[in-house]
């Protein structure tokens, strides 16, 4: 009887544990590639990562959830405003479905952006968090940025005379 109880408990424990989502490894590679491409400032290549239907959260105070066109404009704004952009990831982590808490194949990452403001020549380095969710074709359908975007823009703005 004790063996049966032990086997039942082990089976229950194993069945309740969540493993890695089968798409996570593929989506992780796409995420890493996105960062590699973004820093080259090849806007057309960056645009190709996004599905036609996207919801993306801006990092600016009060920033809206953006559609594809707005998201690409937002990203182009960063590329146009900065030079020598670099991403130094601290880690990449699996994401979870917000409703179920179960792994959903999405990718989250913490790291540092650095570069130089085009207009002022001032350099920056800031800690950021990003999350990306993908469709079955490996295109980004949801994502967002968290960091002090407004503070960064103010810190590297040209000095007022």
Q: Can you annotate each of these PLM segments?
A:
Residues 12-15:
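C-terminal motif of bacterial Sec signal peptides marking the signal peptidase cleavage site
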Residues 1-4:
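Positively charged n-region of N-terminal signal peptides that target proteins for export
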Residues 6-9:
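Sec-dependent N-terminal signal peptides
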Residues 17-161:
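C-terminal and inter-domain tail/linker signature
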């Amino acid at each position: 009887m004790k063996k049966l109880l032990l086997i039942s408990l082990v089976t229950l424990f194993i069945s309740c544990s969540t493993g890695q989502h089968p798409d996570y490894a593929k989506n992780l590679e796409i995420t890493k590639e996105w960062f590699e491409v973004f820093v080259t400032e090849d806007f057309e290549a960056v645009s190709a990562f996004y599905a036609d239907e996207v919801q993306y959260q801006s990092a600016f105070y009060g920033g809206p959830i953006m559609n594809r066109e707005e998201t690409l404009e937002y990203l182009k704004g960063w590329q146009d405003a900065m030079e020598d952009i670099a991403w130094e990831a601290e880690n990449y982590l699996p994401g979870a479905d917000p409703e179920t808490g179960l792994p959903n194949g999405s990718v989250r990452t913490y790291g540092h952006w650095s570069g130089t403001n085009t207009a002022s020549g001032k350099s920056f380095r800031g800690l950021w968090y990003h999350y990306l969710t993908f469709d079955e074709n490996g295109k980004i359908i949801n994502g967002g940025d968290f960091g002090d975007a407004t503070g960064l823009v103010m810190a590297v703005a040209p000095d007022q005379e």
